[in-house]
Amino acid sequence: MERMFLNLLRNSISLIIWVVFFASCASVSSPQGGDIDDIPPELNETSPKILTDIKPTQKITIEFNEYLDESSLKNAITIFPSGEYDFRYEYRGDKIDLWLPSNLEKDITYMIVFNTNLKDEHNVRLKKDIIIPFSRKAVFDSNTIQGNIFGDFNSAFILLWFNHLDKDVILNQPPDYVLNASSNSSYKFNFLPKKDFSILAVEQYGSNINYEEKPFSFYRKNQLSLKDGSLDNINFYLHKMKSEENEDSEEKNDTNDEKNIKTATLTGEVSGNFIHPISLILKNKKNEYSNMIQLDGSYILDGILEGKYQLLVYEDRNNNSVLDMGSFTTNQFAERFFVYPDSLSLRANWELEIPKWNYNIREDK
């Protein structure tokens, strides 16, 4: 009787072990346990390692450093420049097998982009896009467009179209490239061909979003060309819409009504190749101060609340004391502006005189 009981116990334990083993093999998942994961997934490598001389419909393997959330892939993979592509992929835990589209042109570098919708299995999203170039050519296109985004914004996207387009076309035609610049104030497009481009910065991007209803910024001209090489200092300024500015202004006025507020003063001088009238803006997330710069380049700002600020000057072409970022309804593009290279810390009851600020406008490309 005792022997039968021991045999039954052994069989039960063996059965439990086999059930656990097969259950663990039934689905693709990473080992459990360890510290809480709060680090976004990272790209390890691709196979082939360098995706040149690629053939249409060729299979490539993309390996990450951890297991991914399979459900996040659907809205996370895009190919640029934009088009109707018949690619497909297969999820394999920390790897993705991807079969490239059949309709690939020979003379352009494409990009597989994993956007910030991509998550690992612990629901941790990417903080910035992962970009993987591939081409049917032996080398990648090497031209770049880069710059900075200034102002007060929660998110930022840079949109790029082939050719010099009218503004009504930009409103109604999807961009050829989209770059999510939300995690940084700088941006850079890589692997671009030697073509002409139109460019726009927006706070929000999506297929159903009207660019005119959200903060946007044109560049100061509509003719960007990479035919003579790469471009840098293609800078934008995103600021709140008028309704949002009015709400902030009311809050600021309430704050300034308090008694015995001690303030700071900022003075200095600018010089360079600019056209008057030229204005000055000192700004942080809570406060903004502005004034005209005198003909001799001197300026003064009074009544500044203590804090850290960003300083910029701009050519006020239409003399309305506003840094205009262009319009979809007129031929106006963004006004030229320059940002002081360092942030300024102002203390109450202090006067800060900054060194003479000299800047020069390079020849337009």
Question: For each predicted feature, which ranges?
Answer:
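Structural motif
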Residues: 148-158, 258-263, 267-278
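Structured interaction patches on ligand/partner-binding surfaces of diverse proteins
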Residues: 128-129, 204-242, 317-356
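Conserved "repeat-terminator" motif of extracellular CCP/Sushi domains
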Residues: 136-140, 233-243, 252-264, 350-356
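Acidic, low-complexity Ser/Thr/Gly/Pro-rich repeat segments typical of extracellular/periplasmic
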Residues: 26-191, 196-200, 213-219, 225, ...
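Intrinsically disordered, low-complexity segments enriched in Gly and acidic/Ser/Thr residues
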Residues: 291-307, 313, 318
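A short, solvent-exposed beta-strand micro-motif common in secreted/extracellular proteins
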Residues: 108, 195-206, 307-318
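Bacterial N-terminal signal peptides that target proteins for export
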Residues: 2-15
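C-terminal motif of bacterial Sec signal peptides marking the signal peptidase cleavage site
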Residues: 21-24
